[in-house]
A protein has these predicted regions:
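Short linear motifs embedded in intrinsically disordered, charge-biased segments
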Residues: 1-178
Length: 178
């Protein structure tokens, strides 16, 4: 898979558009917890649509986390100059990059364990021939999965995905709040 920068920028723009269109909700006297639930069900779902297939660089993850924090601050009426920490702002919510990683891992596990499709070959496919151009290698899906799980190589990743209980624990560990 190729870099997902264009899709990420489109998702961010659509999420900002949705957030700004609901200004009357964010500025209302509604409870903060209710605003967060509404934010997650509307804006976050728009932002994370299709994120299971993204292979993000560290800079893109940082940009997404910052955008998400700014959006959450706007939704909860917490100004950036107020002395409210991100831990207080997020509360029990996990970081956005952890949510993306958990969704990515969940999809990869489903695809790998599907018996009828050759999706497991697609999930772990790496080119073995050809000439790579100059410069830094592009971030690919397998490397992203390895980074998310801490697996050393594709064989170790495959054994982790094959055991459903172990894989479920990897996914659940990503969703725990910091």
């Amino acid at each position: 898979m190729d870099n997902s920068a264009k899709d990420v920028s489109v998702r961010k723009a659509l999420a900002w558009k949705a957030l700004n269109s609901m200004d009357s909700i964010w500025t209302s006297s509604m409870k903060t917890e209710l605003k967060k639930k509404f934010f997650i069900s509307t804006v976050e779902s728009i932002l994370l649509y299709g994120c299971e297939a993204w292979s993000l660089t560290a800079a893109e993850e940082k940009s997404l986390n910052g955008t998400y924090t700014r959006m959450l601050r706007k939704a909860t009426n917490v100004h950036w100059s107020s002395h409210t920490t991100n831990e207080t702002l997020y509360g029990k919510l996990p970081a956005l990059s952890n949510k993306i990683a958990a969704r990515r891992l969940r999809l990869a596990g489903h695809c790998f364990r599907h018996p009828e499709l050759s999706a497991q070959k697609l999930v772990l496919w790496e080119p073995t021939h050809g000439h790579r151009g100059r410069g830094r290698p592009k971030t690919n899906y397998v490397d992203t999965l390895r980074r998310d799980t801490g697996a050393g190589d594709s064989a170790e990743l495959a054994t982790l995905m094959a055991d459903r209980k172990v894989w479920r624990n990897h996914v659940a560990s990503r969703l725990r709040a910091p």
